[in-house]
């Protein structure tokens, strides 16, 4: 009964937001204008930033705002979606897969021992501020990520490049940090010398976290670079109205002739999925992410819309803070794992676009362990384990729920209510805690939670990005919000990271997954195939499995 009532309240809220969308307000901080009505999204973009020079203006609506526009300083997918348009990396991924292709480097060589990587850079490339892209710019960026004492690391201002530490074995001076030297051979040739092999070094070079920022912009903006991004990408930054919109304009001097095709891109925040769909159908926006799976069939049947499906490349999960009571108790974690009905969540909320998960790693990935036994939904076993944990009379806990829809969890509010209902059936009273997106990420990173909801989308096609990022002890307090620290797991992950034998790497990852499953620092819920939609005026749009696709080739039909 409680669940039905809560869903009714969510329904009322959705209706309110839909009405707000119909009046033209797509942001969280909407209010009436002096004339008593709101301008529509496109009019707001022009009013705030001036007219675009051409008529190719695309509005991309999403559920939440970006956290930072300094790519390496955040793991937030909504940030990477934007920085992908502004910046470029030495290498790029194929439009539809994680195949590594040339980027700012047109060619590269790898030594036989896997310890030297030489990149040959494109010539005649300029940053958006007019300065030259060269090998020294590459070196400056990698050094600032690796060295917290670097003048452009901005550590005193709270910058932490956790993803660099995860993907390159730590930071300057750390025992496992693999980048030993960076040698500028000439303006357009640079060599990376490694202390030991790294099985996914080239994939790292294509990730959205490690593109090249203008050194002149780092000097000019200092720690404000996260709000003043300057790269070499197809679009340049214009403005950012927090929790409302980010505006990018075509970079006229982009290195690839004929691109981009759009004159302007506006990334608009519309928190409610239903409101975004109303805006899409009305022509107010052109692309929406976070489509409710239940709405997919209706979109597919609509002649004015196009339905897209991303590859199954993510995990939606519930995580425990294992260093904090009461979830420092493994029996309690096992009890909760058995109490949550993953099948019901997958069937009720994903409309066939998800499969229940047993481990964090997606099934298509190398090293996926299909022999790990999932915690089956079993309330009786959950009650027994609850008693074993010392909570025969039940207990009260907090569940922190995500405030925005993400590709791995399009309706977090309802998921949290299902989990609340499941746990109360076995004697656990759940209080749902809600925060705005940026504070949510910060507070869970700081360990203020007991139990929380989040997810992870792959950005380089390698298992390490899931398992080490989420569960390696070195990442406690950053991407490891479970505060999970198991030396044996870390050793398997370290060995997998440093091997260039893919079969050996797969074995290490499989062994790590067995230990992780038994420790149960999280409840893997589902691997989803996120759906999104565009109007049929949008051409050449290809959604990437990473959720961060370039819009350089996209255009609007006349």
Which residues are covered by each model-predicted region?
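Gly/Pro-rich hinge or "lid" segments in bacterial periplasmic/extracellular proteins
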Residues: 177, 187-188, 194-260, 264, ...
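Detector for C-terminal structural segments
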Residues: 241, 340-367, 411-418, 443-558
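Ligand-site clamp/hinge motif
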Residues: 223-226, 253-298
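N-terminal lobe/hinge region of extracytoplasmic solute-binding protein
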Residues: 61-112, 150, 230
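Append "and occasionally in soluble cytosolic enzymes with long acidic Gly/Pro-rich linkers
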Residues: 327-421, 485, 511
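Aromatic- and charge-enriched surface segment that lines or borders ligand/interaction sites
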Residues: 106-154, 191
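A bilobed periplasmic-binding-protein/Venus flytrap-type ligand-binding module shared by bacterial periplasmic
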Residues: 122-124, 249-253, 312-335, 339
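Ligand/substrate-recognition segments at binding pockets and active sites
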Residues: 387-460, 530
